[in-house]
A protein has these predicted regions:
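Sec-dependent signal peptide recognition
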Residues: 1-5
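Short, low-complexity N-terminal intrinsically disordered segments enriched in polar/charged residues
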Residues: 15-58, 62, 66
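Surface-exposed, charged secondary-structure patches
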Residues: 92-141
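Short, surface-exposed coil-to-beta transition loops
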Residues: 132, 145-150
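Low-complexity, intrinsically disordered terminal/linker segments enriched in charged
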Residues: 162-182
């Protein structure tokens, strides 16, 4: 019985039949289709992002939230989130009350256009600004910390940020400010 299976496998493995191409199948990416993600050269987007960082450093809540959509989803990598522009204003107004000063440096800006959602719609297609930066914060209790952060901001059709994801380790922030938070 085993020899029959081995012989059958050899015979099927040696099949030299040439498959005909009937032209019914096409390449998934034609010459006219767009790449899934494209780098975009958008100095207005970069300048607006820089202005947002400056407003935050100056504790200017109106300037910081000026480019947020009313229904913005603000998410941190640890799972916490805020929903709505007013919630972002309220949260950061409270944070500004415990921060002595904050400075951002070593910025990297990467504006991209996502022509398709990479995961079936769970992540929005469209214009995104990816940023990496160093943060130095001194709190009113005298404690100072330094860390790197990464933001991913999605822009809606009106040019406002409707998704704001921030990837940071919040543990050092919580430890440095826990005696200031009620």
């Amino acid at each position: 019985m085993i020899s029959v299976i081995v012989i059958a496998a050899v015979l099927f493995g040696c099949n030299n039949e040439v498959k005909k191409d009937d032209g019914a199948t096409t390449d998934t990416k034609s010459a006219t289709s767009k790449a899934p993600v494209e780098l975009i050269n958008d100095s207005n987007l970069i300048n607006a992002t820089k202005a947002t960082f400056t407003a935050f450093e100056n504790k200017d809540i109106e300037g910081y939230t000026a480019n947020l959509a009313d229904n913005v989803m603000f998410r941190w990598s640890g799972g916490d989130s805020l929903v709505g522009k007013q919630a972002v204003k309220d949260y950061y107004t409270g944070r500004f009350n415990i921060i002595d000063n904050i400075k951002y440096s070593n910025h990297i800006f990467l504006p991209i256009m996502s022509n398709v959602s990479p995961n079936g719609g769970a992540t929005a297609a469209g214009k995104w600004m990816l940023t990496w930066f160093q943060t130095n914060v001194k709190y009113k209790n005298g404690k100072a910390i330094q860390f790197w952060a990464h933001n991913a901001q999605h822009y809606n059709d009106a040019g406002k940020i409707d998704i704001f994801a921030q990837y940071i380790d919040r543990h050092p922030i919580i430890e440095a400010s826990k005696d200031l938070v009620k």
